[in-house]
Every structure is written in structure tokens, then in C-alpha cells.
């Protein structure tokens, strides 16, 4: 799935799982808050962590299913 949305980042939470770490990233877009689960701390997540939460910005990203979770693949950060 590929999305281009103006989103507001609300928060990120690290959850310890039996086989590693899972990161829950919460966005607010189109009047709805939604959470994406990121299965690894990759370069894409580092970009996300460097953003100022609560700031609205246009993001193009693709969600790829990975081991019963979603992995964020950023195409661009406006």
C-alpha cells in the first residue's frame, strides 16, 4: 500500500517483544489517529525520530507487510 498524506506525528513507543523490538508509531491524518508498527529500527525510522512530533507535513510512504507487522518505507518527506 502506498500513501501520500499530510500527517501529524503524535508519538512513538518502543515495545519489547520476545524476539526483538517493535516500534509503534502513531500518526494523525484525515481526522483519524492510526498506528503503524515498525519491526526494526532502520534508517527510515531514524528519519521519523528526527522529526518534530505534532508538526504537520506531507509524507509519501509505503507500508509493506512484514512478519505480521508493517514496515514503513519512506519515499519522501516534504
Region locations from a protein language model:
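Beta-strand elements of well-folded, non-transmembrane domains
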Residues: 11-14, 31, 63-65
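Short nucleic-acid-contacting surface segments enriched for D/E, G, S/T with interspersed K/R
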Residues: 42-60
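A mid-sequence interfacial segment
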Residues: 9-11, 38-43, 78
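Structural detector for short beta-strands of small beta-barrel domains
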Residues: 1-21
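OB-fold/S1-family single-stranded nucleic acid-binding modules
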Residues: 62-78
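OB-fold (S1/OB) nucleic-acid-binding surfaces
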Residues: 17-40
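Hydrophobic residues positioned within well-ordered beta-strands of beta-sheet architectures
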Residues: 5, 24-25, 57-59
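Short C-terminal domain-edge/linker segments immediately following a structured domain
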Residues: 35-43, 67-70
